A protein has these predicted regions:
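Non-catalytic accessory regions
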Residues: 1-96
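C-terminal lobe/tail of nucleotide-utilizing enzymes
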Residues: 2-9, 87-116, 282-303
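Walker A/P-loop phosphate-binding motif and the immediately C-terminal alpha-helix
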Residues: 105-181
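Phosphate-binding loop that captures ATP/GTP phosphates
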Residues: 155-216, 234
Length: 303
């Protein structure tokens, strides 16, 4: 299993406190040396930061930002490089929909999504292709289902996994707009007709390996989800990506979410406090059990 990684955000306490940027500490290169190598900082600027650090203390990255030499996002990039972790580069972060940016920048939401990712790593995603597909479901609309699929997929990609997000919400799906995918890109039904075409999908982000396959207008339904063609597509992409996450229509709308869940064999439930119906959630649990679908867990959100 891969080591998990939290979303790297600028935190002065995470910056390397060392004085000599040339000497590694505990096997890690100094943050200042990495910044110079990346072209983010000039040697003269690094020396100025070190002079202040010697006299006043403080963290290297924090001081460099306070002096106007760096932006917080640049320190984040250097920290990720220091720890050999993938990170969401500033240009990619700016490309994301504002709702997703807000979700991953809010500590409460981020904690819920990170916990869900950890559960999936421990209980579901592994090297077996049949355990690489997951449906994200909710009882009704506006219960955070698409946001959950997007955020968990993003966090999984930040562990170094190759992630494919599939939008099975024909006519109402938002994954393409959340990640800035062009509408003329390969559609879900086209991929079902020719699964190998899905293997040529490119990452929507420059800094992480995350691709999106969306359903175009009115072209994917419960019958399509239950078809052998969709099962064949899932088997094909599960042999190529480490994690395949399928966003579904609301469970109460039609049978599509149930059919997708059965094909994926595992499901993650999105719950909105004060909005999701208890009887609806109970019905989902019963139907998942009857369909042989493993319920991996739930993400509880308040918004």
């Amino acid at each position: 299993m891969r080591d998990t990684a939290k979303l790297l955000r600028f935190d002065p306490d995470q910056s390397d406190p060392g004085i000599d940027i040339r000497q590694p500490v505990n096997g890690q290169r100094r943050i200042g040396a990495i910044m110079i190598d990346l072209g983010l900082l000039q040697v003269e600027q690094a020396e100025q930061v070190l002079d202040i650090q010697r006299g006043e203390g403080g963290r290297f990255g924090d001081l460099a930002v306070s002096l106007g030499f760096l932006r917080k996002e640049q320190v984040m990039v250097a920290l990720a490089r220091q720890r050999a972790l993938p990170t969401l580069m500033p240009d990619d972060l700016a490309r994301l929909d504002s709702d997703l940016r807000s979700a991953i920048e809010d500590s409460g939401s981020l904690r819920a999504y990170t916990d869900a990712r950890t559960q999936l790593e421990l209980r579901w995603f592994d090297d077996a292709p049949e355990r690489r597909t997951l449906a994200v479901i909710s009882d009704g609309p506006r219960e955070g289902r698409t946001l959950t699929a997007s955020a968990v997929g993003l966090l999984l990609a930040m562990t170094g996994r190759r992630v494919l997000l599939i939008d099975a919400c024909a006519g109402s799906g938002r994954l393409a707009s959340i990640f800035g995918v062009e509408k003329k890109s390969l559609s879900l039904t086209e991929a079902i007709s020719s699964p190998d075409r899905a293997l040529r999908l490119k990452s929507t982000l420059d800094s992480l390996d995350l691709a999106v396959l969306s359903a175009h207008e009115k072209e994917f339904n419960a019958d399509t989800a239950a078809s052998r063609g969709f099962a064949s597509l899932l088997a094909t992409v599960a042999g190529h990506w480490d994690a395949v996450i399928v966003d579904t229509p609301a469970w109460s709308v039609d049978r599509t979410a149930f059919a997708v869940s059965v094909r994926c064999s595992g499901a993650l439930i999105s719950v909105r406090l004060g909005h999701s119906r208890l009887d609806g959630l109970s019905a989902i649990r019963r139907h998942l059990a009857d369909g042989g679908v493993e319920r991996i867990g739930a993400v509880v959100q308040r918004f």
